[in-house]
């Protein structure tokens, strides 16, 4: 399976002026990193594990995001079924969601994703499970991560 509704081997962009519920979510846990003094960071109060970075310097926000991505790609916690790699197959990535605010600057939300499968969940541990396919069978994509449901036709 793939993470979200997109293929990870190519760049994929969506744009528009809609304000999604995720953008209105507050920081639940502030984070600090002495290397990025111009970036405010925190864990978003949101159903999908998300780290928010806010800063005026696009380069500093990008560098902080790169550090988080590299750390997440190697992160495992078996108590919650997160395993970074199975052999040479990576499982962790992020869904980056960026917007610009005149007051705050660049706001980058990094939704942490894991595409690992098991015998019990062949479509993905963190994808809609079979008992919920009457509600949503497709992968959880960007729009759902940001707070809008896409119900079946």
Q: Where do the language-model regions lie?
A:
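Catalytic or ion-translocation cores adjacent to nucleophile or general acid/base/metal-coordination motifs
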Residues: 1-9, 15-68, 73
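C-terminal accessory/tail domains of diverse enzymes
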Residues: 44-153
């Amino acid at each position: 399976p793939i993470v979200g509704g997109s293929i990870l081997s190519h760049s994929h962009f969506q744009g528009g002026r809609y304000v999604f519920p995720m953008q209105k979510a507050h920081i639940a846990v502030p984070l600090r990193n002495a290397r990025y003094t111009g970036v405010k960071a925190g864990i978003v109060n949101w159903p999908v594990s998300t780290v928010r970075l806010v800063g005026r310097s696009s380069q500093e926000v990008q560098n902080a995001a790169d550090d988080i991505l590299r750390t997440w790609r190697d992160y495992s916690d078996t108590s919650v079924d997160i395993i970074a790699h199975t052999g040479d197959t990576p499982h962790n990535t992020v869904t980056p969601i960026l917007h610009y605010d005149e007051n705050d600057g660049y706001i980058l939300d990094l939704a942490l994703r894991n595409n690992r499968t098991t015998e019990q969940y062949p479509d993905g541990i963190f994808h809609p499970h079979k008992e919920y396919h009457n509600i949503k069978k497709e992968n959880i994509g960007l729009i759902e991560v940001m707070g809008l449901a896409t119900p079946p036709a």
